[in-house]
Amino acid sequence: VSLVLAIESPDQAEVTALLDCSDAYMAELYPPEGNFAVDLHALMQHDISFVVARLDGRAAGCGAIKWLTDGTAELKRIFVADDARGRGIGGRIMDFLEKLAKDRNVKHLFLETGPLNTEAVLMYRTRGFSQCGPFADYEDNPYSLFMTRDMTAGATSPEPVKQRVAS
């Protein structure tokens, strides 16, 4: 079993299907006014780097980083397919995105997630993210949890969790 992460275009049928699954998951948790996922067109802009995690060649997860101003960036659209969860893929996507941020000297990473995304919130907290106020164009609302991580405070990624990979 192999896991390969790379920057790819999100405009691929397999990847858009993954994004559709992410949208469906969010629609189960939050009303339309509480969903802030960027669409395919936005993900293809020059200020976004999009990563795909391929498990044995199949798109199993994705994530993006939006390059903001003044040494900041926002993590977006981090998602792992249901049948690929529990293998550390989300953490590997985070490792990849955090390395991209460090390579560009990003000082502060931000993200917006929902408080009902308990698995994601736990992963972000264990990686050094803490709650903050709204950033960029976001406004405070009951469906959003805003988080940030100081990339300059000697914060390092945790030791990789041993991956359980089914044979």
Model-derived features: where do they sit?
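Acetyl-CoA-dependent GNAT
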Residues: 3-76, 81-83, 94-96, 100, ...
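A generic structural signal for beta-strand entry/edge sites
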Residues: 70-72, 108, 144
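Active-site acidic-Proline motif in GNAT/NAT acetyltransferases
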Residues: 81-83, 87, 115
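Short glycine-rich hinge loops at helix-strand junctions in the catalytic core
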Residues: 88, 105, 128
